[in-house]
Regions:
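PLP-dependent aminotransferase class I/II
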Residues: 1-103
Length: 103
């Protein structure tokens, strides 16, 4: 980790650029033994707990159109990591990820 950083202990978040199919990448990784998990937050105001607040337009404030937040929500996923990962495992994950986006 970089100095003064606090990386996640359980996963590495990946956000696909425009033109990269997240579902294809996730399926490719999973089929090659690299486990993934979907992002579990994203644009919070689209979560069910905001249903009533959206109807009344009360209880929260939105600044801007949140297009970046929507992009992250729709195009991000986690790959699992843990402190005991070997360089060989990390290299394998990187190789599979590169292959997935080049396909």
């Amino acid at each position: 980790a970089c100095p003064d950083s606090k990386p996640s202990w359980f996963g590495f978040l990946i956000t696909c650029r425009e033109g990269v199919d997240k579902n294809h990448v996730v399926q490719y990784l999973e089929s090659h033994g690299v486990q993934t998990r979907m992002l579990f937050s994203g644009n919070l105001i689209k979560q069910p707990c905001f249903d009533e607040m959206r109807k009344s337009h009360e209880g929260y404030r939105v600044v801007g159109d949140l297009h970046v937040t929507d992009h992250i929500m729709e195009n991000s996923f986690w790959i699992g990591v843990y402190p005991g990962m070997t360089d060989a495992k990390l290299d394998y994950m990187a190789k599979v990820l590169c292959s997935a986006v080049q396909e």
